[in-house]
Structures are given as structure tokens and as C-alpha cells.
Amino acid sequence: VLLFLNVVLFCYIYFYDLPRIDERKTLEARRRVYGPEAATIDSLTRSNRTGETVKLEKRTDSWWLTAPYEWPADRNAVSGLTNTLQLLEHETSFAVAELAQSGRSLADYGLADPALTLQFTSAGKSYTTKIGDVTAVGNRLYILSPDGTRIHVVNRSLAESIGLPLDS
């Protein structure tokens, strides 16, 4: 009897649960703003509208603040920021190409002149994300994808990680 129950349980997991687990992983991956490039970040640059720039670079096993001055960076702070970028998921997103049809533009989302620009390099390639206005509800942000084709609505945890005041 126990052998029969084990076989039934195995069949249930194999035929019912495993496809659902794979489906959930696929959905999670689709909601991520960045792909695998966010796992191998070599440098980060944060610039605001006024031109203030903060740059972090990875040197061997440690991170260094290289602009506006040179200083060893706090490993935990940088780790928190890189983890936020790796796990950043959008609540929703829409194509930039659809904006003209609705009579809107990047400026309506604060992305024509973004409050903040976040640039990172990974494996020698540069990725730039523009961070725009806070949504009407106030707990989310508009960001423009690195390829410039999608606007993502993300949680404000991104702003908190990079030190952006939410009223900016």
C-alpha cells in the first residue's frame, strides 16, 4: 500500500507540479526588468538632472567609489544595490511605440529629462536606464528600459537603493 501511495505521489509531482513550477519560473523571468547581465555588474554610475555623478567600480574583489572622489565603497550597500537590480521586477510595462497612439510622450512619465540616469557595465557592455517620475499612487516609479523600447512601472525600492528622494 505504501509503495502504491509513493508511486501516486511521484506521478502527481512529476506530471502536475513540475510543469507549474517551470511556468512560475518563466513568469518571474518575464517580469524581471534586467536579464542575466545584472548578475555580473562591473561598474555603476548614477547621474541626476543637475549633473551630480556618483560612480562605483569593481576592482578585483572590492568596490570603489571613483566619482566624485576615490574611496572604498561599503560592500553591503553595493551588494544591496546590485541585488535590487538583479531582482527588479515590474508591476506592469508598456511599449514606447504605443505612446503616440495614446497621445502621450516620454515627458509625461518624466523620462524625456529623467530625474536620474543609472548606467552599469557588465561583461564590457554598457546598459543605461532612465528613472522618471513617481506614479500617481506614489509608491512606484516609471523607468525606461536600457534598450529604450519599454516603460516599466517598478516598486520604489529601486529609488531607495540608489538614494533618490521620492519627491524628486
Name each region found by the language model.
Residues V1-S168:
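Soluble, acidic/polar mature domains that operate outside membranes
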